[in-house]
UniProtKB/Swiss-Prot annotation:
Cofactors (names): Mg(2+)
First-level EC class: transferase
Protein name (database record): Ditrans,polycis-undecaprenyl-diphosphate synthase ((2E,6E)-farnesyl-diphosphate specific)
EC nos: 2.5.1.31
InterPro entries (UniProt xref): UPP_synth-like (IPR001441), UPP_synth-like_CS (IPR018520), UPP_synth-like_sf (IPR036424)
Native species: Legionella pneumophila subsp. pneumophila (strain Philadelphia 1 / ATCC 33152 / DSM 7513)
Keyword RNA-binding: no
């Protein structure tokens, strides 16, 4: 493919439950099927040498779902980490986790830390799994850290700018997304990367996440390649 490619893609993997319900299956079966799509898109990113992929796996609002579904999602996440970590490492994938880890189980937190430590030197792809995250939480938490840094005398008030503030976000060290993808027909970003998506190209598709395959990913990349990214400026033709 000769057209330009995004270097950081952020994905809201929506529609697992609706996919299952449309087939007369329990919602949890949709979450299981969604893992296959995760693997497909990771492989696509490796093939196309895309440097960073962020997957919104669990939002801070998802705790309001039925307890049985939340528990299943946490167990599925833990099981997938244990099962896939060696393969991810062998393919040169660096795992990172964005979000508030404190409410997660100690077992899951340890597995996440171990995965980050094991893959920290890998350079083929950054796989950023976003868990228990909300964009408002990220900004408020960053503001608190920034205020504490100023009060401690480590930073002057007049030194604060956008670049400095971004260093206190949970995504510090990662580039801002070039392309945002949301599946299942919802036309919103749902409190995901509110700061980071300021100039990101948005792509929405009606396809449920378990049906989002290599072809659907290619369509998103083609759409991105047709965009004129202006970052608040005007194009040369205007």
């Amino acid at each position: 493919m000769n057209h330009k490619l995004p270097q950081h893609i952020a994905v809201v993997m929506d529609g697992n439950g609706r996919w299952a319900e449309s087939r007369g299956l329990p919602r949890v079966e949709g979450h299981k099927a969604g893992l296959d799509s995760v693997k497909k898109i990771i492989n696509c990113c490796l093939e196309k040498k895309i440097s960073c992929l962020s997957l919104f796996a669990f939002s801070s609002e998802n705790w309001s779902r039925p307890v049985t579904e939340v528990n299943f999602l946490m167990e599925l996440f833990l099981e997938a980490l244990r099962k896939e970590i060696d393969d991810l490492n062998q393919h040169g994938i660096r795992l990172k986790f964005t979000g508030d880890r404190e409410p997660l189980s100690q077992i899951l937190q340890k597995q996440m830390c171990d995965a980050e430590a094991l893959t920290k030197n890998n350079q083929q792809l950054i796989l950023n799994v976003v868990v228990n995250y909300g964009g408002k939480w990220d900004i408020v938490t960053a503001a608190r850290k920034l205020i504490r840094t100023v009060l401690d005398g480590k930073l002057a008030y007049d030194e604060i700018n956008e670049a400095v503030f971004a260093q206190f976000l949970d995504t510090n060290g990662m580039p801002e997304p070039d392309l945002f993808i949301r599946t299942s027909g919802e036309l919103r970003i749902s409190n995901f990367f509110l700061w980071q998506l300021a100039y990101t190209e948005l792509y929405f598709t009606d396809v449920h996440w378990p049906d989002f395959n290599e072809h659907e990913f290619e369509l998103a990349l083609i759409s991105f390649a047709k965009r004129a990214r202006r970052f608040g400026q005007i194009s040369q033709s205007e």
